[in-house]
A protein has these predicted regions:
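Expand to "…catalyze enediolate/carbanion chemistry for C-C bond making/breaking, isomerization
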Residues: 1-401
Length: 401
């Protein structure tokens, strides 16, 4: 799998100074975490899950979550589980024919997760799926906290599954988890610090099992009876942005964990109250004013602004609930040529000092920015480096056509 794999070779050469790396499910975990990008959620009740997964992978999705939790009514859980088990079995069968070679219907590889409700459900699904679990990268764990011991119970269930997989097939790839931070214990101010401390402790003790940490902004907002409009970003909702800041402070340090951006809920047009958040000049310079209008009509300017703020606050990738969001997240995850040269400049001078940047427009201080440079180079491997004259408008145009 590779980001922007749908682009032609000439288009890739035009857009990228350094193309995204080819990835596999066996790639280094830090690279896979950085490469998650737009993680597209899909309810497990979809009537043709396999078709949906194949279609979205072909369109550029690199990570998907099949959801058995909040997107599924309680009464529909048994049917959703059966549907999921059948879909994973079909995907597994299509990956290899009886001779062990890929079949003609083999879907593009992507990171596929299942969002479960309870540790017991995780264990039950694993038993029902058997070898079909090979198509998964892991599980998404809701309302992750360890004050009640819930986090450890989920991790114990994961260990049971991985032990069984290794016993059945020595060398089997271990499954990992992506916890979602959305529990009221972590949201409310009086319990937040102690809860985050406990979360960090259990994550650190089980670091090899953790791919990335996700933020559940919908549950955070609902804890206060709030919901942001399409004219606002999650960072305008101060009580929620304060929680995000504390999460990054505790878990997002250089020796911490990859943390993904919260979901953007809006995808249809409607009456607007505030001015659009996309300047017209970058689109005019690229002769793409029509693209700007398309983004505004679909209410995607707010998403673009929120992605910028996610990145400024140390978050990588984003949870998305509509396929139209995927190309925007990925286009805005490409590293600029300027940032790439800065990262190379800084990482090559670990002894310290300061010097003008390669673009001669800022001061690069070598020691303070080592962690930023290292992170930027990992992201460059995942999403590529834009060519010197390529802007995010060019990447958006190529991604959305």
């Amino acid at each position: 799998m590779r980001h922007f794999s749908y682009l032609s070779a000439p288009e890739t050469d035009r857009l990228f100074h350094l193309a995204p790396q080819e990835l596999s499910l066996d790639s280094d975990a830090s690279l896979l975490a950085a490469a998650l990008g737009a993680t597209l959620y899909c309810p497990a009740t979809r009537p043709d899950l396999v078709k949906d997964i194949r279609k979205q992978a072909a369109r550029g999705a690199v990570s998907m979550v099949i959801c058995l939790e909040d997107s599924i009514a309680d009464a529909d859980v048994p049917a959703a589980e059966t549907n999921l088990v059948a879909a994973l079995a079909e995907l597994h069968a299509s990956r290899n024919s009886a001779s062990g070679t890929p079949t003609s219907g083999t879907p593009p590889e992507l990171m596929l997760f299942v969002r479960v409700r309870t540790p017991e459900q995780l264990l039950s699904l694993a038993e029902r799926c058997g070898r079909s679990l090979d198509v998964l990268t892991g599980f998404v764990i809701p309302k992750f906290e360890n004050v009640t011991g819930a986090a450890q119970r989920f991790l114990d269930a994961l260990h049971t599954v991985n032990d069984a997989r290794r016993a059945a097939a020595p060398g089997a790839r271990p499954l990992r988890v992506m916890p979602i931070l959305e529990s009221p214990l972590m949201i409310h101010a009086e319990t937040r610090t102690s809860t985050l401390t406990g979360i960090f402790a259990v994550l650190e003790a089980n670091r090899p099992d953790i791919l990335a940490v996700r933020i559940g902004a919908t549950d955070m907002s609902s804890a206060y009876g709030l919901r942001r409009s399409r004219d606002l970003t999650i960072y305008d909702v101060k009580v929620v942005s304060a929680v995000i800041g504390d999460i990054v402070n505790r878990l997002g340090r250089p020796d911490g964990f990859v943390i993904s951006g919260p979901v953007w809920e809006h995808y249809s047009s409607g009456e607007r109250l505030l001015r659009p958040m996309l300047r017209s000049s970058p689109f005019a310079e690229a002769d793409e004013l029509g693209l700007r209008q398309r983004l505004l009509t679909a209410n995607l300017d707010g998403l673009i602004r929120e992605i910028e703020l996610d990145q400024a606050n140390g978050l990588l990738g984003k949870t998305v609930i509509h396929p139209s969001h995927v190309p925007l997240v990925h286009a805005m995850s490409v590293i600029s040529h300027e940032a790439y040269l800065d990262a190379l400049h800084i990482s090559g001078a670990s002894g310290g000092g300061a010097a003008a940047s390669p673009y001669r427009n800022k001061m690069n201080e070598m020691k303070p920015h080592q962690a930023w440079a290292a992170s930027t180079l990992v992201r460059a491997a995942a999403f590529g480096v834009a060519a010197p004259d390529i802007t995010y408008v060019d990447l958006l145009e190529a991604s959305m056509n």
